[in-house]
Amino acid sequence: MQIENSAAIVTGGASGLGAATARALAARGARVALLDRNAAAAAALADEIGGIAVTCDVTDETAVRHAIARSATAHGPLRIVVHCAGIGTAGRIVGRDGPMAQDAFEHVIHVNLGGTFNVLRLTAHAMSQLDPAGEERGVFIATASVAAFEGQLGQAAYAAAKGGIVSLVLPAAREFARFGIRVMAIAPGFFETPLMNELPPDAVQKLVAEIPFPARFGKPEEFAQLALAIVENPALNGETIRLDGALRLPPR
């Protein structure tokens, strides 16, 4: 898929991996719509890159439909979606205070997996109505996690949600093949994000020690670089790519 002059949506686009991806797409000439719950941060970045900002909860069908319509009105046919929105929470299934609350588990699944599916189904439907751009109509990139493969203690809900995203990619790609819509996922390891930047130095050193090479947190720009490579390579479809410096998470 050509990036220049293509309309793109980036969810979770106001910070972290989403913001880096939005900047990278805009730098290559894409017309970017930032979807985020943080209206002020999204608006500031939209002004910086010449895009638009739409306040959006990715689990809300009405909000996502509105965002797709806003993008189409401002930028034309939607071709690229990079879904970065999600939450990271920790909690043991059975902790000192008893079993994890069922609604706490369901909330993580609802936001991370349900939100991904909601954005996927609605944007894919919009893309399916378009005329092809070359040999394809669009591409959707989800954000999984290495926790999908090696969930640590306290990550049961998060790992289950991200594992669901990994499992969603292939059947979705097979289903959308008739439309010429690709579906991919990136599974990042430890990255420089607002959450990670709040960790104390000793905790950072402990995490970095688990990464073979490069022995550091990934940079959001490196996530964005892979996202753009996926967009431009039509043979990449139905797969989750780990982006982790050969990291394999230990049990804790």
PLM segments and residue spans:
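Canonical Rossmann dinucleotide-binding motif of NAD(H)/NADP(H)-dependent dehydrogenases/reductases
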Residues: 2-33
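The beta1-alpha1 cofactor-binding region of Rossmann-like NAD(H)/NADP(H)-dependent oxidoreductases
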Residues: 39, 56-67, 102
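Catalytic Tyr-X3-Lys loop
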Residues: 87, 98-118, 140-141, 165
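Conserved mid-core segment of classical short-chain dehydrogenase/reductases
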Residues: 88-106, 125, 129-134, 154-157, ...
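Active-site helix of classical SDR
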Residues: 120, 161, 169
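C-terminal substrate-recognition "lid" of short-chain dehydrogenase/reductases
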Residues: 131, 219-243, 248
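Residue(s) in the substrate-gating loop at a strand-loop-helix junction
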Residues: 145
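Short, small/polar-rich loop/turn modules that mediate ligand/substrate recognition or access, typified
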Residues: 177, 182, 236-239
